[in-house]
């Protein structure tokens, strides 16, 4: 087995996951998407981050 | 036992192949921007940039720490500190002047956070890859990283599932430096660690190679751009846990027992497309960017490393620990160390000390796990 096989399997794994998720998740809507830049948008940042404290119990 | 690294001769891709792949990548990015929204296309592109920079300049976080500990080579660690300082120079004013539009990687210091960072430091040396490093290495054909990655994701899901319980063991409020004085303290702290690294390092190891300088410029620029686009700093491990959460929910699991995954924001992300999740997109980009560099270099013909069974088993366990501990620690080298310190979070400094101590143990463990020859 060579490194190319590992890359191929990794990329296939990602593609299959994204494909399955695309089929099972809420549909995408570019007209409801946030603007390109959060900076200057006037909208609060809502993305998830690993450093965000957990929700209060 | 060490890895076999003999490269097989392979010819680099030709002009037509390279052009076709670049056109395909550009089409994919534009397609995502059109289908999901411009921000998401941009985040995938930024993630690819991170992957290109890390793999292209052979820069990272785990290797430089290893070389500092084993060889007293301070150059990589110094490059990391300079990169964080550049990000902080831009991030602090952005955070101060833009209210809710921009948020930092601010997390509380706690018992589980410190323990998590220590375990993460040890595990990343076993796998030879942190959060970004595991993704980049998997994307460039490293079998150890590719095996560790799914278990990293499972661990990240599990750590997030139990996160509220762990933080209840003892945790301070979130403490973050801000404004000019906060920036000055951050830069002074980075400089102090840099001086310490130079003093402890071998003679002339403070000289930073040109490729590290290029990596520093690229990573800092991309990290600042990420902050402006996403409104939050670069992170890695949330996305990995989300992938598993999506998988278990698709298989019928009920996550209402987890305060973390049942929280409205996280529950919403489980049902939303992964193509709208910030960290997932940059994670995909890291893998894709690294794969592109590896293919471009014609470096995919090398055989994968040969290790004993116990080494592969160790990689699986270390992968699980990487994921679980990084959630307890509120981030990996990227989310906690790089972005935490770069946006003023005190937990980033504590994370650095704990993870560096853990790295020392991880390096000592590698020979006993069959991942390298005993010295």
Which functions belong to the PLM regions below?
Chain B
Residues 2-375:
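Membrane-interfacial helix-loop segments of redox and metal-homeostasis proteins
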């Amino acid at each position: 087995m060579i490194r190319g096989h590992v890359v191929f399997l990794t990329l296939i794994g990602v593609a299959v996951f994204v494909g399955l998720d695309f089929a099972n998740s809420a549909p995408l809507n570019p007209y409801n998407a946030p603007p390109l830049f959060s900076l200057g948008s006037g909208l609060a940042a809502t993305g998830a981050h690993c450093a965000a404290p957990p929700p209060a119990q | 036992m060490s890895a076999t690294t003999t490269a097989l001769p392979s010819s680099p891709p030709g002009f037509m192949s390279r052009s076709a792949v670049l056109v395909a990548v550009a089409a994919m990015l534009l397609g995502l921007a059109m289908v999901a929204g411009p921000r998401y296309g941009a985040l995938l592109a930024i993630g690819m940039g991170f992957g290109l920079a890390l793999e292209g300049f052979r820069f990272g976080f785990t290797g430089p720490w290893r070389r500092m500990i084993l060889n007293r080579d301070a150059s990589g660690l110094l490059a990391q500190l300079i990169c964080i300082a550049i990000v902080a120079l831009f991030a602090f004013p952005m955070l101060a002047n833009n209210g809710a539009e921009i948020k930092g990687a601010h997390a509380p210091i706690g018992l589980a956070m410190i323990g998590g960072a220590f375990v993460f430091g040890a595990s990343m040396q076993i796998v030879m890859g942190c959060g970004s490093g595991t993704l980049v290495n998997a994307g460039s054909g490293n079998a150890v990283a590719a095996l560790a990655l799914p278990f990293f994701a499972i661990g990240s899901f599990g750590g997030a599932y139990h996160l509220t319980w762990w933080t209840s063991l003892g945790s301070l409020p979130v403490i973050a430096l801000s404004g000019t004085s906060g920036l000055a303290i951050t830069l002074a702290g980075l400089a102090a660690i840099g001086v310490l690294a130079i003093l402890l390092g071998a003679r002339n190891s403070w000289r930073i190679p040109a490729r590290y300088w290029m990596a520093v410029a690229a990573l800092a620029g991309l990290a600042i751009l990420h902050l402006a686009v996403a409104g939050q700093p670069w992170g890695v491990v949330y996305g990995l846990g989300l992938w598993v959460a999506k998988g278990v929910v698709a298989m019928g699991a009920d996550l209402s027992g987890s305060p973390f995954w049942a929280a409205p924001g996280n529950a919403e992300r489980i049902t939303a497309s992964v193509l709208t999740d910030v960290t997932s997109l940059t994670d995909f980009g890291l893998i894709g960017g690294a794969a592109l560099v590896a293919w471009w270099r014609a470096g995919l013909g090398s055989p994968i490393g040969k290790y004993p069974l116990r080494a592969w088993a160790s990689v699986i366990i270390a992968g699980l620990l990487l994921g679980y501990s990084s959630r307890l620690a509120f981030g990996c080298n990227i989310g906690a160390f790089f972005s935490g310190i770069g946006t003023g979070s005190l937990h980033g400094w504590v994370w650095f000390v704990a993870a560096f101590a853990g790295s020392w143990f991880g390096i000592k463990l590698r020979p006993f796990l069959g991942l390298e020859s005993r010295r």
